[in-house]
Structures are given as C-alpha cells and as structure tokens.
Regions:
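Residues immediately C-terminal
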Residues: 139, 173-177, 208
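Helicase-associated low-complexity/disordered flanking segments
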Residues: 1-68, 72-75, 234, 254-257, ...
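Conserved SF1/SF2 helicase motif Ia
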Residues: 79-82, 89-116, 194-196
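Conserved interdomain linker/interface between the two RecA-like ATPase lobes of SF2 helicase motors
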Residues: 191, 198-200, 205-277
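SF2 helicase catalytic motif II
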Residues: 146, 150-151, 159-201
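Conserved catalytic network of the ASCE P-loop NTPase/AAA+ motor domain
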Residues: 70, 96-100, 123-125, 137-141, ...
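Conserved nucleic-acid-binding Ia/Ib motif block in the N-terminal RecA-like helicase ATPase lobe
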Residues: 102-155, 214-217, 224
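A short beta-strand-to-loop transition that corresponds to the Sensor-1 phosphate-sensing loop
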Residues: 82, 110, 148-152, 173, ...
Length: 277
C-alpha cells in the first residue's frame, strides 16, 4: 500500500471512530456504559450512601474518600484542621461495625473528651448500643460501640481481653503519638491490636502525615492516607492590650502585625502598663 493510500485509510478510520463515539457505538462503549451503571448502582446501595443520606450537609471530597476506605475495610489516617469534619469518619466507622455485627472502640486521649463522644454516639445509635469505659467510669462496657481512653484499650490488650469480635478502633487525636510522655500508649495500641482490626486514625494537620501513614501501613499492612489542609472554620488571632482587643495581624499583608496593635503596645509600655496578654 502506498503512503498516500495509507494516509487516506488512516483518515477514514479516524472519521468512523469519531462517528461511532458520537452515537455511542465505539469499541468498548457498551462495556463502559455498563461498568459506569454498575458502579453507580453499587455506590447507591453502599453503606456510605446510606450514611450520607442521613446527614444534613454534603461531605467534602476528603470525607467521601475516607468513608469509602473505611467501608472497604482498610485502615485510614485522616489529617485535617480542627473543625474540618474528621469526626464523621469515626462515626461512620462505628456505623459500619454495627451493620456488620462487629464491635467498635472509639478512643480519646482524655476523659472529658470520652464523655463528650459517648453522648454524641448515644444520640446517633442509642444508649443501648454505646458504652463508656474510662479509668473511673464504666457504663454498658459490653455494648457494640464503646468509648474509652487510649490507656484503657492498651490495658485491655495487655490483659488479653477477647477482641475477636472487634472490627474497628477509632483513634481520635492520634497526633498525641508524638507526645513524649503518652505517645508510647498510641504506638503500643497500633502495633499490638489484632491483625483483623481496622484502624481509623484522626489527626490534626501534621507535617509528617505521609511518614506517619507509611508507618501505620508497615505495621498494619494497609493504610490509606488522606490529608486535607482546607480550614472551613476561619481562625482569627487577637491580642488584648489593657482593656482593648486588637487583631494580631494587619488586614493586608500576610504575616504583618497590626499597626494599631503595635502602637497600643508601645503606648502601654511607655505608660508602664502591665495589662497585655
């Protein structure tokens, strides 16, 4: 075949392919449409879809990614600013465990936060399904979902407590692992939990999230790392000088101190004021 005839044949083939694509008859188009339909049907019937339908808001992309990872049974590390919505990932983990007939442990670093999460989960799943176990309080500790301090879970592991029916552990405020005094507790829990237990680690934004997630993946065999730096709730910083409150930074100029604050501080120092804080 001459080069000229080959070029004509190529142009004709491309024209037919474009026409078939436009009318939906291209190679693989039927398979692609079926695959898309099947994926949509599966998504609509998923636990995630049912959970999301109960929410009063539309989850952000990072939340959807985390929910899908949880439903797939993978461990997941979610690092996002305070107020970004990490909590619903932990709540969904408890929901999945309940739907699958497994137990879920929701751990926090302090008793006050455990009490708060206990009340939140009671509102979601009913007090019959939620328990509380801290150092000095035990409420319905045999419930399918139990809120506890991380130390309580560590002690359960070392005491050989039966965990065969435990499906997931939510580690709230997992960035405490970097704490010199209490960090080893989180480390021991992550390392010594039974292999079948998935971990949902919720953390404030940290600089080494990828490294942290890689370590969890190393000791737990799987971990999806999801990082969001979007702060939906604005963070404002102020300073009080005497009886007045000032914005810490100028409205324009990133990182530049508020000139009114600087002037007020100097004036206070000149007058020997000691009221700045």
């Amino acid at each position: 075949m001459s080069p000229k005839r080959r070029r004509h044949r190529t142009r004709d083939t491309e024209h037919v392919a474009r026409h078939e694509e436009e009318v939906g008859l291209g190679v693989g188009s039927a398979a692609q449409r079926y695959a898309a339909y099947k994926a949509e049907a599966q998504a609509a019937s998923s636990l995630r879809a049912r959970w999301v339908s109960t929410l009063s808001f539309t989850p952000d992309p990072f939340q959807i990614q985390a929910l899908d990872a949880v439903e797939a049974g993978s461990s997941v590390l979610v690092a996002a600013p305070t107020g970004a919505g990490k909590t619903i990932v932990g709540q969904f983990g408890a929901y999945v465990a309940l739907e699958q007939g497994m137990r879920a442990f929701y751990t926090t670093p302090i008793k006050a936060l455990s009490n708060q999460k206990y009340l939140e989960l009671c509102d979601l799943y009913g007090s019959d399904n939620v328990g509380l176990a801290t150092g000095d309080t035990s409420v319905n500790s045999g419930a399918p979902v139990v809120v506890m301090t991380t130390e309580v879970l560590r002690n359960m592991i070392y005491a050989g407590a039966p965990l065969d029916d435990l499906g997931v552990v939510i580690l709230d405020e997992v960035h405490y692992l970097a704490d010199k005094m209490r960090g080893p507790v989180w480390e021991e829990v992550i390392i010594h939990l039974p292999a079948h237990v998935a971990i949902i680690a919720l953390s404030a934004t940290v600089s080494n999230a990828e490294e942290f997630g890689a370590w969890i993946r190393e000791v737990r065999s799987s971990c999806e790392i999801i990082v969001s730096e979007k702060r939906p709730v604005p963070l404002y910083q102020h300073m009080i000088v005497g009886e007045d409150i000032f914005d810490l930074y100028a409205p324009t100029g990133k990182g530049k101190l508020n000139p009114e604050l600087v002037a007020a501080t100097r004036d206070s120092e000149m007058r020997g004021g000691r009221g700045s804080r």
